[in-house]
Amino acid sequence: MTEPSIDIPKESSKSILFQFVLFPLGIVAVGVGIFLLFGRLASEEHTIPDYLNEIRAGSSHERWQAAYQLSKSLKRGEAKRYPNLEEQVASIYRGSKNDDPRIRQYLSMVLGTIGDHRATPVLLEALNDRETETRIYALLALGELKDPAAVPRMVEAARDGDKDVRKTAFFALGEIHDPSAVDVLVSGLEDRVADVRWNAAIALAQFSDRRAAPVLRTMLDRTMLARIPDMREDQKEDALIVGMTVYPKLVGAEARPELERIATSDPSLRVRDAAKQALAALR
């Protein structure tokens, strides 16, 4: 596992799962650096039509920056103020196939936030893109759309040769929660890459399928985590916390011995606190 995890926020288990399982280094680095490098767009007052116009007609740098700002500015439900927004964004998306890939990547986020299933075919087409990160963003957006029609193609993505694509596909399939994905989620439990297995197990656990339990339990085992090449200490803590979020919900009181062990003996205060919270939730 070579990509770093993002700093994990304290707000909710949902945030922890989302932040931990996704975003390889290239995506994170771009997102973190944008405000430092390109503050002009952020500091000016822009409306959604302004961003759309800049994406259409700006310079190469201005276009992807505007796409990023639009993805950050648009709130779920706000699209109702702009009846043709999905159509406009989808049109720009289709026309930007040969442009800076960041334009399509950030517009994928916009389409996901809009939440209109008419965007599903556009995003499914993006799963054929040569850019790995573009495929990842499209999968994330499809997970947000929760359109069952996307599941067959996303199942194919779960068998992709790139581990980050597989990882994201499993996460997004869990978001859609369509029973037709269960078989591929089960197959993902045997993936050769640890965090791909974890994503498959996390998604499968949402179906209350106990076949996910053995893989989830490995996330609570520091000895097992120590065998994963290049895994940093903070990533190990992240895995433990995510595992303690999901595993007890699946197996109930069976998780108590593991949680008690972690709560009393883990070297990380952050992990011990998470174990105590998980124990309290069992009571």
List the model feature ranges, each with a label:
Residues L41-E54, R76-G95, D116-N128, D147-R159, ...:
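Amphipathic alpha-helical scaffolding segments comprising HEAT/armadillo-like alpha-solenoid repeats
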Residues G58-S59, D99-D100, R130-E131, G161-D162, ...:
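Short inter-helical turns and helix N-cap capping residues of alpha-solenoid HEAT/ARM repeat scaffolds
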Residues Q19-G39:
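Hydrophobic membrane-insertion alpha-helices, especially the h-region
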Residues R102, L220-A239:
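Acidic, Ser/Thr- and Gly/Pro-rich intrinsically disordered linkers and low-complexity segments
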Residues S71-K72, G112, G143, G174, ...:
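Structural signature of alpha-helical solenoid repeat scaffolds
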Residues R56-S60, W64-I114, K163, F171, ...:
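Extracytoplasmic/periplasmic/luminal assembly and interaction segments
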